């Protein structure tokens, strides 16, 4: 029973959103994610972006991450976008009404980096210059997030305030946000009933499905903060997460653009593999 409870805690701490961040990864656990977005571009050709991510829990409250991204625009060749190095720290040892986490990320990208890990600043996110020129342009920055979240049993609410500091001329800061509400699957409730559902339910079962909403967008920059929101990108998505096993989960998020410069449609997918003390002890549940 203790092993199962530990697995449930690890799974409950698996973030279901694509842009919003909340829980730290369990201590000594490794979370691997392969994510891909199909975007119906407002300006230019449609494109597909991809990101590979690895998160590791150094302590119960401190997580480090490395991410790399690329993209394929219709009619053009595949291009490498760059690398991200991130870390986030949960400030409180115990649960609070508002659980506070601080996040920092160094970005070493090029002008062809199009994956929407976050949205900040002003204007659209499509590539409007030749790909060959964009790949030669260095884009270095430092992203900071103030993360607040709370769980009411299976219901999670998460908010991220995002600031991106440009580390090269003309410097400056861009701002954004991400907000999510997610209702976890019944097997992740942490209750005796949820644990029974996990051990008894077949691989294909509605009890393994979680669902919610995520909204993310930009808030301007130093000079124009929270003004003319229609000139900034905003998206609303329906989040679906399916717990396949003690190690694997699948996420899908169809999203629509809410402003004149947003891409009209975006389909986000993600496959997650979690390995650590809790999941390795729970492998027998999958057999």
Name every feature range the model reports, one short phrase each.
Residues 3-287:
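Transmembrane beta-barrel domains of Gram-negative outer membranes and organellar outer membranes
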């Amino acid at each position: 029973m203790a092993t199962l409870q530990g697995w449930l805690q690890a799974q409950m701490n698996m973030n279901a959103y694509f842009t919003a961040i909340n829980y730290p990864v369990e201590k000594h656990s490794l979370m691997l994610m392969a994510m891909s977005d199909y975007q119906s571009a407002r300006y230019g050709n449609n494109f597909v972006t991809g990101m590979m991510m690895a998160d590791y829990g150094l302590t119960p409250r401190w997580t480090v991450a490395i991410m790399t991204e690329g993209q394929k625009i219709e009619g053009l060749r595949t291009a490498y976008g760059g690398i991200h190095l991130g870390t986030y720290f949960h400030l409180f040892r115990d649960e609070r009404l508002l659980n506070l986490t601080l996040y920092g990320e160094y970005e070493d990208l090029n002008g062809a980096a199009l994956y929407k890990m976050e949205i900040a600043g002003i204007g659209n996110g499509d590539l409007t210059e030749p790909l060959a020129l964009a790949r030669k342009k260095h884009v270095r920055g430092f992203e900071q997030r103030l993360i607040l979240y709370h769980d009411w049993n299976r219901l999670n609410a998460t908010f991220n305030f995002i600031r991106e500091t440009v580390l090269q001329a003309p410097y400056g800061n861009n701002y954004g946000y991400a907000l999510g509400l997610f209702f976890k699957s019944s097997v992740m409730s942490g209750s005796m009933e949820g644990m029974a559902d996990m051990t008894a339910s077949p691989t294909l079962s509605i009890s393994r499905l979680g669902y919610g909403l995520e909204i993310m967008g930009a808030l301007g920059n130093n000079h124009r903060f929270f003004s003319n929101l229609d000139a900034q990108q905003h998206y609303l998505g329906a989040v679906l997460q399916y717990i396949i096993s003690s190690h694997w989960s699948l996420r899908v998020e169809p999203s629509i653009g809410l402003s004149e410069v947003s891409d009209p449609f975006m389909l986000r997918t993600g496959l997650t593999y979690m390995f650590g003390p809790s999941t390795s002890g729970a492998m027998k549940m999958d057999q």
